[in-house]
Curated annotation (Swiss-Prot):
Part of the 50S ribosomal subunit. One of its GO terms (cellular component) is mitochondrial large ribosomal subunit. The lineage of its organism: Eukaryota, Viridiplantae, Streptophyta, Embryophyta, Tracheophyta. It is found in: Plastid, Chloroplast. InterPro entries: NA-bd_OB-fold, Rib_uL2_dom2, Ribosomal_uL2, Ribosomal_uL2_bac/org-type, Ribosomal_uL2_C, Ribosomal_uL2_CS, Ribosomal_uL2_dom3, Ribosomal_uL2_RNA-bd_dom. Its main location: plastid. Signal peptide: none annotated. This is Large ribosomal subunit protein uL2cz/uL2cy. Residues 1-23, 223-274 are annotated as: Disordered.
Amino acid sequence: MAIHLYKTSTPSTRNGTVGSQVKSNPRNNLIYGQRRCGKGRNARGIITARHRGGGHKRLYRKIDFRRNEKDISGRIVTIEYDPNRNAYICLIHYGDGEKRYILHPRGAIIGDTIVSGTEVPISMGNALPLTDMPLGTAIHNIEITLGKGGQLARAAGAVAKLIAKEGKSATLKLPSGEVRLISKNCSATVGQVGNVGVNQKSLGRAGSKRWLGKRPVVRGVVMNPVDHPHGGGEGRAPIGRKKPTTPWGYPALGRRSRKRNKYSDSLILRRRSK
Protein backbone atom coordinates (compact mmCIF):
# COMPACT_ATOMS: atom_id res chain seq x y z
CA MET A 1 0.00 0.00 0.00
CA ALA A 2 1.38 3.39 -0.99
CA ILE A 3 1.53 5.98 1.82
CA HIS A 4 0.71 9.56 0.80
CA LEU A 5 1.28 12.76 2.77
CA TYR A 6 -1.27 15.54 3.13
CA LYS A 7 -0.44 19.14 2.37
CA THR A 8 0.31 20.92 5.65
CA SER A 9 -2.76 23.16 5.69
CA THR A 10 -3.90 22.29 9.24
CA PRO A 11 -2.22 20.67 12.28
CA SER A 12 -4.12 17.42 11.73
CA THR A 13 -3.18 17.09 8.06
CA ARG A 14 0.41 18.08 8.84
CA ASN A 15 0.86 14.97 11.01
CA GLY A 16 -1.39 12.56 9.12
CA THR A 17 -0.80 10.16 6.28
CA VAL A 18 -3.25 8.30 4.10
CA GLY A 19 -3.02 5.02 2.24
CA SER A 20 -4.20 4.20 -1.25
CA GLN A 21 -7.86 5.12 -1.57
CA VAL A 22 -9.89 1.93 -2.02
CA LYS A 23 -13.63 2.53 -2.32
CA SER A 24 -16.26 0.26 -0.86
CA ASN A 25 -19.54 -0.53 -2.60
CA PRO A 26 -20.53 -3.85 -1.01
CA ARG A 27 -23.17 -6.21 -2.39
CA ASN A 28 -26.40 -6.23 -0.39
CA ASN A 29 -26.56 -10.02 -0.10
CA LEU A 30 -23.05 -10.19 1.38
CA ILE A 31 -23.49 -7.65 4.19
CA TYR A 32 -25.58 -7.34 7.34
CA GLY A 33 -25.86 -4.93 10.24
CA GLN A 34 -24.42 -5.65 13.65
CA ARG A 35 -24.98 -4.20 17.09
CA ARG A 36 -22.16 -2.75 19.13
CA CYS A 37 -21.90 -5.19 22.01
CA GLY A 38 -21.52 -3.16 25.18
CA LYS A 39 -18.52 -1.02 24.14
CA GLY A 40 -16.13 -3.04 26.27
CA ARG A 41 -18.69 -3.97 28.95
CA ASN A 42 -19.81 -7.39 30.12
CA ALA A 43 -23.40 -8.54 30.68
CA ARG A 44 -23.55 -6.59 33.96
CA GLY A 45 -22.40 -3.36 32.33
CA ILE A 46 -18.97 -3.41 33.98
CA ILE A 47 -15.95 -2.34 31.92
CA THR A 48 -13.81 -5.38 31.09
CA ALA A 49 -11.95 -3.95 28.06
CA ARG A 50 -10.87 -0.36 28.58
CA HIS A 51 -10.56 2.40 25.98
CA ARG A 52 -13.43 1.24 23.78
CA GLY A 53 -16.57 3.08 22.76
CA GLY A 54 -18.12 5.22 20.05
CA GLY A 55 -16.89 4.81 16.52
CA HIS A 56 -18.60 4.90 13.16
CA LYS A 57 -21.40 2.49 12.32
CA ARG A 58 -20.28 -0.54 10.33
CA LEU A 59 -21.84 -3.11 8.05
CA TYR A 60 -20.28 -6.54 8.38
CA ARG A 61 -19.02 -8.17 5.18
CA LYS A 62 -19.40 -11.95 4.98
CA ILE A 63 -15.90 -13.25 4.25
CA ASP A 64 -15.37 -16.73 2.82
CA PHE A 65 -12.67 -18.14 5.09
CA ARG A 66 -13.57 -21.76 4.21
CA ARG A 67 -12.96 -21.47 0.46
CA ASN A 68 -15.21 -24.47 -0.15
CA GLU A 69 -16.03 -23.71 -3.79
CA LYS A 70 -13.87 -26.62 -4.89
CA ASP A 71 -12.38 -26.86 -8.39
CA ILE A 72 -14.43 -23.90 -9.65
CA SER A 73 -12.38 -20.99 -10.91
CA GLY A 74 -13.32 -17.49 -9.83
CA ARG A 75 -12.41 -14.03 -11.11
CA ILE A 76 -11.50 -11.01 -8.97
CA VAL A 77 -14.06 -8.33 -9.82
CA THR A 78 -13.40 -5.65 -7.18
CA ILE A 79 -10.92 -4.79 -4.43
CA GLU A 80 -12.77 -3.09 -1.57
CA TYR A 81 -12.19 -1.48 1.81
CA ASP A 82 -13.53 -3.35 4.86
CA PRO A 83 -14.10 -1.32 8.06
CA ASN A 84 -14.03 -4.48 10.18
CA ARG A 85 -10.39 -5.40 9.45
CA ASN A 86 -7.15 -3.75 8.35
CA ALA A 87 -6.84 -5.93 5.23
CA TYR A 88 -8.66 -5.26 1.97
CA ILE A 89 -11.17 -7.75 0.57
CA CYS A 90 -11.91 -9.02 -2.96
CA LEU A 91 -15.24 -9.81 -4.55
CA ILE A 92 -15.01 -13.10 -6.45
CA HIS A 93 -17.36 -14.19 -9.24
CA TYR A 94 -17.23 -17.98 -9.61
CA GLY A 95 -18.06 -19.90 -12.74
CA ASP A 96 -21.26 -21.36 -11.26
CA GLY A 97 -22.66 -17.90 -10.48
CA GLU A 98 -21.65 -17.81 -6.81
CA LYS A 99 -20.31 -14.49 -5.48
CA ARG A 100 -18.16 -14.29 -2.35
CA TYR A 101 -15.69 -12.06 -0.53
CA ILE A 102 -12.16 -13.26 0.32
CA LEU A 103 -9.12 -11.58 1.84
CA HIS A 104 -7.11 -9.66 -0.74
CA PRO A 105 -3.79 -11.44 -1.46
CA ARG A 106 -0.81 -9.14 -1.93
CA GLY A 107 -0.22 -8.40 -5.60
CA ALA A 108 -3.63 -9.60 -6.81
CA ILE A 109 -5.35 -7.29 -9.28
CA ILE A 110 -8.79 -7.09 -10.83
CA GLY A 111 -9.21 -9.77 -13.49
CA ASP A 112 -6.96 -12.38 -11.86
CA THR A 113 -8.30 -15.92 -11.57
CA ILE A 114 -8.21 -18.04 -8.40
CA VAL A 115 -9.33 -21.56 -7.55
CA SER A 116 -9.45 -23.85 -4.53
CA GLY A 117 -9.13 -27.62 -4.43
CA THR A 118 -6.71 -30.50 -3.93
CA GLU A 119 -4.78 -30.45 -7.20
CA VAL A 120 -4.53 -26.77 -8.11
CA PRO A 121 -1.47 -24.70 -9.09
CA ILE A 122 0.70 -23.18 -6.35
CA SER A 123 -0.10 -19.60 -7.30
CA MET A 124 -1.18 -16.51 -5.41
CA GLY A 125 -4.73 -16.64 -4.05
CA ASN A 126 -5.30 -20.35 -4.61
CA ALA A 127 -6.43 -22.42 -1.62
CA LEU A 128 -5.37 -26.04 -1.14
CA PRO A 129 -4.44 -28.50 1.63
CA LEU A 130 -1.00 -28.24 3.24
CA THR A 131 -0.19 -31.77 2.10
CA ASP A 132 -0.19 -30.58 -1.54
CA MET A 133 2.13 -27.60 -0.94
CA PRO A 134 5.93 -27.69 -1.28
CA LEU A 135 8.13 -26.71 1.65
CA GLY A 136 8.88 -23.01 1.93
CA THR A 137 5.51 -21.89 0.56
CA ALA A 138 4.26 -18.55 1.90
CA ILE A 139 0.65 -18.92 3.05
CA HIS A 140 -2.14 -17.13 4.92
CA ASN A 141 -5.73 -17.81 6.08
CA ILE A 142 -4.71 -21.13 7.65
CA GLU A 143 -7.16 -23.60 9.14
CA ILE A 144 -6.59 -25.03 12.62
CA THR A 145 -9.53 -27.44 12.49
CA LEU A 146 -10.36 -29.16 9.20
CA GLY A 147 -13.40 -27.59 7.54
CA LYS A 148 -13.78 -24.76 10.07
CA GLY A 149 -12.19 -22.13 7.87
CA GLY A 150 -9.01 -20.10 8.12
CA GLN A 151 -8.16 -18.72 11.55
CA LEU A 152 -4.43 -17.93 11.42
CA ALA A 153 -2.52 -15.21 9.50
CA ARG A 154 -5.50 -13.10 8.43
CA ALA A 155 -4.34 -9.56 9.32
CA ALA A 156 -2.96 -7.10 6.78
CA GLY A 157 0.54 -8.12 5.70
CA ALA A 158 0.40 -11.44 7.58
CA VAL A 159 2.24 -14.41 6.11
CA ALA A 160 3.24 -17.81 7.48
CA LYS A 161 5.73 -20.31 6.12
CA LEU A 162 5.47 -24.07 5.66
CA ILE A 163 8.79 -25.42 6.96
CA ALA A 164 8.26 -29.18 7.43
CA LYS A 165 5.88 -32.09 6.88
CA GLU A 166 6.11 -35.30 8.88
CA GLY A 167 3.49 -37.97 9.51
CA LYS A 168 0.03 -36.46 9.83
CA SER A 169 1.27 -32.99 10.78
CA ALA A 170 2.82 -29.98 9.09
CA THR A 171 5.11 -27.49 10.82
CA LEU A 172 4.40 -23.81 10.29
CA LYS A 173 6.23 -20.65 11.29
CA LEU A 174 3.56 -18.07 12.09
CA PRO A 175 3.86 -14.27 11.74
CA SER A 176 4.44 -13.94 15.51
CA GLY A 177 7.50 -16.21 15.30
CA GLU A 178 5.69 -19.16 16.89
CA VAL A 179 6.42 -22.58 15.40
CA ARG A 180 3.57 -25.05 15.74
CA LEU A 181 2.09 -28.24 14.30
CA ILE A 182 -1.12 -28.37 12.25
CA SER A 183 -2.83 -31.25 10.48
CA LYS A 184 -1.61 -31.68 6.90
CA ASN A 185 -5.22 -31.98 5.73
CA CYS A 186 -6.02 -28.40 6.77
CA SER A 187 -6.23 -25.84 3.98
CA ALA A 188 -4.46 -22.52 3.51
CA THR A 189 -4.25 -19.81 0.86
CA VAL A 190 -1.04 -19.23 -1.07
CA GLY A 191 0.59 -15.82 -0.72
CA GLN A 192 0.60 -12.91 1.71
CA VAL A 193 -2.32 -10.79 2.85
CA GLY A 194 -2.37 -7.42 1.12
CA ASN A 195 -2.28 -3.86 2.49
CA VAL A 196 1.20 -4.47 3.89
CA GLY A 197 2.03 -0.87 4.80
CA VAL A 198 -0.98 -0.29 7.04
CA ASN A 199 1.21 -0.13 10.17
CA GLN A 200 3.16 2.79 8.68
CA LYS A 201 0.08 4.97 8.40
CA SER A 202 -0.29 7.87 10.86
CA LEU A 203 -3.82 8.92 11.79
CA GLY A 204 -2.69 12.48 12.48
CA ARG A 205 -5.41 13.50 14.93
CA ALA A 206 -7.48 12.22 17.82
CA GLY A 207 -10.74 12.29 15.88
CA SER A 208 -9.52 9.63 13.46
CA LYS A 209 -8.88 7.36 16.42
CA ARG A 210 -12.38 7.98 17.77
CA TRP A 211 -13.89 6.99 14.41
CA LEU A 212 -12.30 3.58 14.94
CA GLY A 213 -14.06 3.17 18.28
CA LYS A 214 -10.96 3.74 20.43
CA ARG A 215 -11.12 6.07 23.43
CA PRO A 216 -8.24 7.97 25.07
CA VAL A 217 -5.67 6.10 27.19
CA VAL A 218 -4.84 7.80 30.51
CA ARG A 219 -1.80 6.81 32.57
CA GLY A 220 -2.53 5.49 36.03
CA VAL A 221 0.23 7.59 37.62
CA VAL A 222 -1.71 10.80 36.90
CA MET A 223 -4.92 9.50 38.50
CA ASN A 224 -6.08 9.64 42.09
CA PRO A 225 -5.54 6.65 44.42
CA VAL A 226 -9.25 5.88 44.29
CA ASP A 227 -9.02 5.35 40.52
CA HIS A 228 -5.73 3.47 40.10
CA PRO A 229 -3.08 1.79 42.32
CA HIS A 230 -0.41 4.00 40.69
CA GLY A 231 -2.27 7.21 41.54
CA GLY A 232 -1.66 9.81 44.21
CA GLY A 233 1.44 11.44 45.62
CA GLU A 234 2.83 14.93 45.36
CA GLY A 235 3.92 15.97 41.89
CA ARG A 236 5.48 13.31 39.68
CA ALA A 237 5.64 10.57 42.28
CA PRO A 238 6.73 6.98 41.52
CA ILE A 239 4.10 4.24 41.52
CA GLY A 240 5.13 3.07 45.01
CA ARG A 241 5.14 -0.64 44.08
CA LYS A 242 7.68 -3.21 43.01
CA LYS A 243 5.90 -3.90 39.72
CA PRO A 244 3.26 -2.13 37.63
CA THR A 245 -0.32 -3.25 38.13
CA THR A 246 -3.64 -2.99 36.34
CA PRO A 247 -6.39 -0.70 37.69
CA TRP A 248 -7.70 -3.75 39.58
CA GLY A 249 -4.38 -4.56 41.24
CA TYR A 250 -3.25 -7.50 39.08
CA PRO A 251 0.33 -7.65 37.71
CA ALA A 252 0.75 -5.88 34.37
CA LEU A 253 3.42 -5.65 31.65
CA GLY A 254 4.87 -9.12 31.38
CA ARG A 255 2.48 -11.46 33.15
CA ARG A 256 1.58 -14.42 30.97
CA SER A 257 -2.12 -14.51 30.19
CA ARG A 258 -2.24 -17.90 28.43
CA LYS A 259 -4.08 -20.65 30.32
CA ARG A 260 -1.97 -23.40 31.78
CA ASN A 261 -2.24 -26.97 30.49
CA LYS A 262 -4.07 -25.91 27.35
CA TYR A 263 -4.73 -28.71 24.88
CA SER A 264 -2.64 -27.05 22.16
CA ASP A 265 0.52 -26.73 24.31
CA SER A 266 1.80 -30.00 22.85
CA LEU A 267 1.42 -28.60 19.31
CA ILE A 268 3.58 -25.50 19.95
CA LEU A 269 7.22 -26.33 19.27
CA ARG A 270 8.54 -22.82 19.95
CA ARG A 271 6.80 -19.92 21.62
CA ARG A 272 6.36 -16.64 19.82
CA SER A 273 9.18 -14.13 19.98
CA LYS A 274 8.60 -11.25 22.38
